[in-house]
C-alpha cells in the first residue's frame, strides 16, 4: 500500500543522509 511505499522512500532517504554524514564528499 501507499504507507509501505512512503516508509521505503523515507528509509532510503535516511540511509543516504546517514552515509553523507559519515562520508561527506
UniProtKB/Swiss-Prot annotation:
The keyword Secreted applies. It is found in: Secreted. Expressed by the skin glands. One of its GO terms (biological process) is defense response. Keywords: Amphibian defense peptide, Antimicrobial, Secreted. Signal peptide: none annotated. Coiled coil: none annotated. The keyword DNA-binding does not apply. One of its GO terms (cellular component) is extracellular region. Antimicrobial peptide. Belongs to the gastrin/cholecystokinin family. Magainin subfamily. This is Xenoposin precursor fragment R2.
